[in-house]
Design a protein with these regions (language model features):
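Intrinsically disordered, low-complexity segments enriched in polar/charged small residues
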Residues: 7-8, 19, 255
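N-terminal signal peptide c-region/cleavage motif recognized by signal peptidases
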Residues: 14-18
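N-terminal alpha-helical modules
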Residues: 22-281
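Domain-scale selection of a single, long terminal region
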Residues: 1-2, 22
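Sec-dependent N-terminal signal peptides
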Residues: 4-13
Length: 281
């Protein structure tokens, strides 16, 4: 049941409509949808840009041992953005014939698996993995990858095992100590600031009371959805690794939606004027 709730929450965070969620910053009250509608109805200047957010490249995860929820399975990547490969993918699941028992499957059997670039649909680098029994996608975060929920578990009939790669793959929770927790706390402050700024800029650009209401409602749900997902991350309360990574993912998502709504003038700036050459003497 907990896995099902977490999957639903992850789906909300990753696949929300353009009117998306915002993190409620510490010390601030949850946004009032009615107030959001009033502000959206008031004519305001369109912001020139949302807060700057530089999504990480594949170097942030290549060569690092990653575990699902910081405790289960194993994922290791190699190569670059144009030739990314999965060197190791181990999934922990349940025995099909006896769901009360756990099973472990080594996907690929040690043979590197190609991960093809799928662009940046939600602001982060996305890669697609075409495994016959278990196709999935993942987004690249800082020291982690985030795989969205699947419609159904991957079935490995010969191994009598079913498993899912969905969730946050990151550093082992047991390896994150006090020093790492302090760095994570600083990263969270930056991520929350970017998220708040991107939400505000998107609200202004929407310029529609109904959409502003939807965005405000999604905002108020984000914090609880994130908590549901990160509850299963190993030692999350001691370091907050999952919390900051999902906050960064949401900030990137809002930035992508903001950019999609850019006025035509911003998307297609006029060509630069050529300087006239002085007449030759």
């Amino acid at each position: 049941m907990r896995r099902s709730l977490a999957a639903s929450a992850l789906c909300m965070i990753l696949a929300a409509p353009p009117a998306s969620a915002q993190l409620v910053l510490p010390g601030s009250a949850a946004p009032d949808p009615a107030a959001g509608a009033e502000k959206a109805a008031t004519p305001r200047k369109t912001p020139k840009a949302a807060a700057a957010y530089a999504p990480p490249g594949v170097e942030a995860v290549v060569g690092r041992p990653l575990s699902l929820n910081g405790a289960n399975g194993a994922l290791q990547l190699s190569g670059g953005a144009d030739a990314l490969k999965i060197d190791r993918l181990t999934l922990l699941g349940e025995v099909i014939s006896d769901p009360t028992r756990q099973c472990r499957i080594d996907v690929g059997g040690g043979t590197p698996i190609e991960a093809k670039s799928a662009g940046r649909p939600d602001g982060l680098l996305r890669f697609a993995v075409d495994i016959p029994a278990c196709p999935f996608e993942f987004d690249v975060l800082d020291g982690a990858v985030l795989a969205p929920p699947q419609l159904k578990a991957c079935i490995f009939e010969q191994a009598d095992c079913q498993a899912s790669p969905s969730g946050l793959w990151g550093a082992a929770g047991s390896a994150l100590g006090a020093a790492e927790a302090k760095q994570i706390e600083q990263a969270r402050a930056h991520a929350e600031a970017a998220l708040a700024a991107n939400y505000h800029a998107l609200t202004v650009r929407l310029n529609d009371p109904a959409k502003a209401n939807d965005l405000a409602r999604d905002q108020s749900r984000f914090s609880s959805d994130r908590q549901d997902i990160c509850r299963d991350y190993a030692r999350e309360s001691a370091h907050g690794f999952c919390t900051v990574r999902l906050t960064e993912a949401r900030a990137a998502f809002l930035k992508a939606r903001f950019d999609e709504l850019a006025p035509a003038a911003e998307k297609n700036p006029p060509p630069a004027r050529r300087k006239r050459k002085p007449p030759q003497q």
